[in-house]
């Protein structure tokens, strides 16, 4: 038996009043994905929230939308807070939002953008504030984990491009609570090293939480204050951190950072050879022009027999030839001497020269260097590296 016949408006009003007096519906917090997001000319925001099975229409009035800390987009996963009420005219209900929050990593994203905007306004990202990188770095400092893939990648690049380049490694934490202070200390210590050309701050890939240390404000300011130029090679190519924005040069990976810092020795030799060839071409071309000019003079003056003029022209040419030959020899000798001096300097800094002094390097089966007697377990196979070769032994 039905209680009472109601009009459509009456039942819609009843539903609205019921919803407006419901505690849960008046304090709703809903998780879902944004779709059909639109900003009206009035400033009101309209969108839907959906999950795998359902969707709900949402509205956020201009007064509440002004407090948004991010610009919502379709596909974003959010948590919407507000009240659910009915719209009497068409019998629909919707969520009236007071606040929107990004789900999961949203708070980190907001913190990142807030710090980025702050430091950018202070001028820490300006190109004119960035220090120039040395053209030919001979001594490089590296701040990274001593056990991570980043240091292996950097050493491999250094060995391939210029094995005489001196690498100073400052072992540091690169994630976790104390990592930022550890890296800051490393920057300060390496700034004390005499004749240090550049610092590489590196870490392999990881999640946003693992890379979060490189979004630390104190670390960013220390990078900015560094007197030695700093190259960052953090994560993968798609990873960007605050440290990348404030550093003097951002590289997409640790390997790329090493390639920026360490010039290829073969490339330098090739460049020197190109200079030599260009100089030879210039000299030969100049001589050819002089000889052609002389031939023209001889032809034009042949009937008048101006022997003295011709002799003078030949003397001028001989003088030019001698001068150019002398210039070529001086320049080539100078380049050879400079290259020899660089080679001797780089060779003297080669860490492998220590083997020539009677020392040895012991590695386990994986290639890891053994530093303490505790690592020499019985039956363990090791490789002993000496200046004239290496040999495997088994610990008894």
UniProtKB/Swiss-Prot annotation:
Pfam families: Exonuc_VII_L, tRNA_anti_2. HAMAP family: Exonuc_7_L. Bidirectionally degrades single-stranded DNA into large acid-insoluble oligonucleotides, which are then degraded further into small acid-soluble oligonucleotides. Belongs to the XseA family. GO terms for molecular function: exodeoxyribonuclease VII activity; nucleic acid binding. The keyword Transmembrane does not apply. GO terms for biological process: DNA catabolic process. It comes from Clostridium tetani (strain Massachusetts / E88). This is Exodeoxyribonuclease 7 large subunit. The gene is xseA. It is found in: Cytoplasm.
